[in-house]
């Protein structure tokens, strides 16, 4: 058994390990400033192509996304859908602006395949991936393009918020709180060491040269998870690729760059959380234990965000803090113990569990009534997180109609054939072919840092593969 002094140091150690990141990130978030728009920008709207992968057949939400994107006057929007939806989306494109919107398709719905169908078609210097349920502000493009004045900048994201409905409820508040915390974490970590957990696919801009690189395409279409090919988690892969290839990532946390979106305002939100949790487990485990460069290139982000996937369990931590304080204060006076427990209670439930939402409460003071819901859901989320851990091989969407057919789930994660196997590769698609010949220099794991390869015309050594390259 620990002595009273031992319990005291156990309490102090747990407190520092859990809350050092909160204190430092508060300072970082409060002092963060977005990159300003230059007086004479190198990049403009005509340098931007928007790629919008979707399985929607149309509808007000998709139409609204297209219209708000067009207001920013990009060079082109490429809608990538499945063959069955081409007719409907072509009619929608003609209805909105047939000169600016192009419709492409693949046979089977899968976001990575749809993205790879469109990427070679891009002729502009910047490509922006957009989800089909977002609303862009009019001045988004100047803000999201500003960081690219730095030639080392490979990708840029923006702040995001949920559309606030006329009638609020607890589910909507949880939606809004999730995005608010995400903005807070990303801006804080980027300000310290340039890292962030993931560049969100809702809206993210990239240099087209990165996406059109053959090594990127090979890595993007051959990512694996254990013995399976992984076709989900596309935004996580691109984020890790940028960092592993020495590109910088930026985030424009500014009202004029704020993208609005919708999330499930009901029990389906739990399915969204489960999907995000699985993605976090898979990507953060790869970052820390497979790619590993994060430990020295973004040490703070690794401590503050990545490792919390493994270590941050709210209920056990909070219970241990109160218990260790109880054991450490057994010889204190009653008044001192009451004061210590009161301060700890206020610190945990008054400050640390709400500080990331201060901006939200400032905008909507009435939402303070949902603080108990927010705290309770934080504890419940531990169960979601645990279930995500034990079901990592599942890739169900859970919250979108038509997204979880047996065929779509098969495509998102498929078994790899054994090395040397002559069994036909179940990953093949009639409309999406994986590269059969790959330049030798490209046969690198997606996480290896290497210089961008020279033009393929300069290479004569090729290797023929029958199975995807993977560790």
UniProtKB/Swiss-Prot annotation:
Primary location recorded for the protein, binned into one broad class: membrane
Keywords (A to Z) from UniProt: Cell membrane, Glycoprotein, Glycosyltransferase, Membrane, Transferase, Transmembrane, Transmembrane helix, Virulence
Glycosylation positions in this chain: 29, 88, 222, 458
Transmembrane among keywords: yes
Localisation per UniProt entry: Cell membrane
GO cellular component, one term: hyphal cell wall
Signal peptide (residue range): none
Pfam families referenced in this protein's UniProt entry, alphabetically: Glyco_tranf_2_3
Bilayer topology: Multi-pass membrane protein
Coiled-coil intervals, chain numbering: none
Gene Ontology MF term list: glycosyltransferase activity
CDD domains in the cross-refs: GT2_HAS
InterPro entries on file: Glycosyltrans_GT2/GT47, Nucleotide-diphossugar_trans
EC number: 2.4.1.-
Single GO BP term: hyphal growth
KO phenotype (gene knockout): Severely impairs hyphal growth with filaments both shorter and growing in a sinusoidal manner. Results in a dramatic loss of disease causing ability on wheat leaves.
TM helices/strands, residue ranges: 4-24, 305-325, 339-359, 368-388
Entry function: Glycosyltransferase involved in the maintenance of the outermost surface of the fungal cell wall. Likely functions in the synthesis of a currently unknown, potentially minor but widespread, extracellular or outer cell wall polysaccharide which plays a key role in facilitating many interactions between plants and fungi by enabling hyphal growth on solid matrices.
UniProt record similarity statement: Belongs to the GT2 glycosyltransferase family.
The protein's name: Type 2 glycosyltransferase
Lineage of the species this protein comes from: Eukaryota, Fungi, Dikarya, Ascomycota, Pezizomycotina
Gene name tied to this protein: GT2
């Amino acid at each position: 058994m620990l002595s009273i002094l031992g319990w005291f140091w156990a309490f102090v150690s747990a407190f520092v390990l859990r809350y050092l990141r909160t204190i430092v990130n508060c300072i970082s978030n409060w002092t963060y400033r977005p990159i300003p728009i230059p007086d004479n920008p190198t990049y403009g709207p005509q340098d931007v192509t928007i790629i919008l992968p979707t399985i929607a057949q149309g509808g007000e939400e998709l139409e609204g996304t297209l219209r708000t994107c067009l207001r920013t006057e990009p060079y082109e929007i490429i809608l990538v859908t499945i063959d069955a939806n081409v007719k409907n989306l072509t009619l929608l494109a003609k209805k909105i602006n047939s000169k600016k919107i192009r419709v492409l398709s693949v046979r089977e719905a899968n976001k990575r395949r749809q993205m790879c169908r469109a990427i070679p078609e891009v002729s502009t210097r910047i490509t922006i991936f957009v989800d089909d349920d977002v609303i862009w502000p009019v001045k988004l493009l100047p803000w999201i393009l500003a960081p690219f004045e730095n030639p080392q900048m490979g990708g840029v994201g923006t702040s995001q918020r949920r559309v606030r409905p006329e009638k609020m409820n607890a589910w909507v508040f949880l939606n809004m709180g999730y995005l608010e915390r995400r903005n807070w974490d990303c801006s804080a970590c980027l300000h310290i060491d340039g890292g962030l957990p993931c560049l969100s696919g809702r809206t993210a801009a990239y240099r087209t040269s990165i996406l059109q690189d053959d090594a990127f395409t090979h890595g993007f279409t051959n990512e694996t998870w254990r013995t399976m090919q992984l076709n989900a988690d596309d935004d996580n892969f691109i984020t890790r690729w940028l960092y592993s290839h020495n590109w910088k990532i930026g985030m424009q946390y500014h009202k004029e760059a704020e993208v609005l979106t919708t999330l499930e305002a009901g029990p389906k939100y739990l399915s969204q959380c489960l999907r995000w949790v699985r993605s976090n487990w898979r990507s953060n485990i790869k970052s820390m234990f497979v790619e590993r460069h994060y430990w020295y290139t973004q040490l703070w982000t690794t401590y503050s965000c990545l490792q919390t996937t493994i270590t941050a369990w709210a209920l056990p931590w909070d219970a241990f803090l109160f218990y260790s304080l109880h054991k450490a204060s057994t010889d204190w006076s009653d008044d001192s113990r009451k004061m210590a427990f009161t301060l700890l209670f206020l610190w945990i439930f008054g400050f640390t569990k709400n500080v990331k939402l201060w901006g939200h409460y400032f905008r909507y003071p009435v939402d303070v009534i949902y603080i108990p819901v927010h705290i309770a859901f934080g504890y419940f989320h531990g169960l979601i997180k645990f279930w995500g851990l034990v079901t990592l091989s599942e890739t169900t969407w859970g919250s979108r109609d038509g997204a979880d057919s047996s065929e779509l789930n098969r495509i998102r994660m498929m078994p790899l054939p054994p090395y040397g196997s002559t069994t036909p590769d179940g990953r093949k698609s009639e409309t999406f072919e994986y590269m059969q010949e790959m330049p030798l220099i490209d046969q690198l794991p997606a996480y290896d840092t290497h210089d961008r390869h020279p033009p393929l015309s300069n290479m004569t050594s090729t290797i023929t593969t029958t199975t995807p390259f993977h560790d």
